[in-house]
Structure formats: structure tokens, C-alpha cells
């Protein structure tokens, strides 16, 4: 959490700052999995992609780009593909991306599909706290709904988001409860809520979403194409359109494009997004 503080020197952040260098060289810490939340509120606090090996880094660009794609924002197909393939614009050689769609701060995954706006009045700050831009949507009704069509649409969107996460190159981070549709009733800053807003209601699990997440996990464990951390190049994959032809520049630049296929040349595995 707030990892840039570990490498902040008088002239700014340095990935080779003494503390970070000592951690890499330490006989105990050096071979551990090191994970950075690469931003804080200090000067020069946003350092995504700069920690270097062996650090893994929370990738909020992944979160935002994937939410925007599934929200239906125009012109997002290129960013979607970049995140799906490991975020080569942020990392070199191997992906060190920790891919996530929701975290302890912000909306839960289910709330991303049920609330277009934050609802933080219970926090006592007149809804001023919490991020204002969540790249979320509500499927036509803000908040809780008993409309079966709305419920089905939200469940479909949650499944699509989970499927995207489990099909992405990099390390998966899934917040507790997101695998079965946990809601915070639109509260995106619930750290101080020790009540039903933040609690996990085990008896209220959406078993359909839970089964979908379980199946995705089982499948991913056997899929070396996704667990390999090497960044993908043209020799490894080809991006196809819905007709099975390589995407053209014009297709990549089409703001309305919503479909693509990621085809792995060696194994023949194809991931279809539509």
C-alpha cells in the first residue's frame, strides 16, 4: 500500500532507492513475492510500471480500461487488447501486472454494474468522499432492482468482467466477495463501515456467479498461454476479427468495434471477445 513512499528521495521517486535496493538484496525478502500499490498522495506519487523486477504492481490502468470497454465506451478496443495481453506499454520483457477489476477501495465488482454514481451518504461526508469517476454503469436502474431483465443483464456483465480477468496475461487479484456478487449498496469508500455495508454476507451469495468464477479458475490453471508471464509479440499471437481475418488498422481505429479474437499461434487457443 502507498509503495512509492518506500522509494521517495529528495529529488523524487527512484526505483533504486536504498530501501528498495536493500529489499531486493535481503536474504529473506529477496526471493519473496513483492507486490506494490504503485501510487500514493505524495509528490510524484503515481509510479505504475517503474518499480522494476522482482516487483509485481497493481495495475489500475487495467481496471479502468476493462471497465470502460464493458461499459460500452467508444474507441476502447485497443486499450482492451493491450491490457488482455499483459500491458506491454507499462512493462518490459515480462508482465508484472497485477490485474484487477475492483479492490478494497472503490466499488465492488457487482456495484460496477448496478450503480452509475457513488452513494456514500452513510459515511457522513455528504457524498464528497470516494472517487467520483468509477467507469461504472447501472443497466438502466440505479441500485437494487427486482426487474428480472435488469438482474440478468447485471449478472451477464459480471460474468463478462470475470471472464476477461481470468483470460488476461498477468497475475489475478480478486477482492473477497466479488466471485459471488457482493454489493456495498453503491458505497465506494466503505473502509469505516463495520456493518452490513462492508460485511460479506455468505448466505446471500449469487451461486450462478460463484460457479462461473470457480470454473474460470479451474480452466486458467491448465492454460499455460495465460499463466506465462512473457510479453506477447507478433510471433506469438495474431488478433483476428469476427470473420477470422487479421484486424486491419482501420478496424483497430473503429470507435464502434466491440469484437476481436486473440489467437495463440503455437497452441491454437483462441479467446473470443464479443
PLM feature segments, named:
Residues 182-214, 218:
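Extended hydrophobic/aromatic segments used for targeting, binding, or gating
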Residues 7-11, 148-153, 203-207, 249-252:
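Short, contiguous acidic/charged loop-to-helix segments that flank catalytic cores in large enzymes
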Residues 241-274:
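Carbohydrate-binding surface patches
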Residues 1-7:
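Short acidic catalytic loops
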Residues 9, 14-176, 180, 189-193, ...:
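Conserved alpha/beta catalytic core and glycan-binding cleft of carbohydrate-active enzymes
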Residues 3, 39, 203:
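Anionic group-transfer/hydrolysis microenvironments
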Residues 204-233, 244-246:
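Aromatic- and carboxylate-lined catalytic core of secreted/periplasmic carbohydrate-active enzymes
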